[in-house]
Amino acid sequence: MHDTPVTLVGNLCADPDLSVTPQGTPVANLRLAVTPRVRDGEQWSDGPTSFYRVTCWRGLAEHAADTLAKGNRLVVTGRLRIRQYETDDGRKGHAAEVDADDLGPSLLFATATVHRTSGNGGQAASGDPPPS
């Protein structure tokens, strides 16, 4: 299976949800709302909003939980996955999810102060799969 690289720009729907796997690996789940701007004649308007679950691992997860808050506009790069699911009542659906390689605040409408951490923040080398 080939990874599909994506870059998303959108708004964080809630504060990051940080937890730790049974193996002790930090993981943060985020929900990102992405609304494209579309040209309608002489004016711009909002297109349909898409929602993505974004998963961050290790140091990136901890940094996201320490830094980000609901409403922040983010730039996310990662690998897209489409997950199939079935609800309790038997309905089937699909969900778009992104395993984040990197993320940060969008500076288009905000400013940020950067604080460097030592080392690589506990991140695996780029391209390493998340823990199983």
PLM feature spans:
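Acidic, gly/ser/pro-rich intrinsically disordered tails
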Residues: 1-4, 18-24, 39-45, 62, ...
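Hydrophobic core residues within well-ordered beta-strands of beta-rich domains
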Residues: 6, 10-12, 26-28, 50, ...
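OB-fold and OB-like beta-barrel modules that bind single-stranded nucleic acids
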Residues: 8-12, 32, 70-82, 100
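Conserved positions in beta-strands of structured domains
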Residues: 13, 17-19, 57, 81-83, ...
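Short coil/turn motifs at secondary-structure junctions
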Residues: 15, 35-39, 59, 83-85, ...
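OB-fold (S1/OB) nucleic-acid-binding surfaces
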Residues: 25-51
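Beta-rich strand-turn-strand
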Residues: 57-93
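A short hydrophobic beta-strand segment most commonly corresponding to one strand
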Residues: 95-105
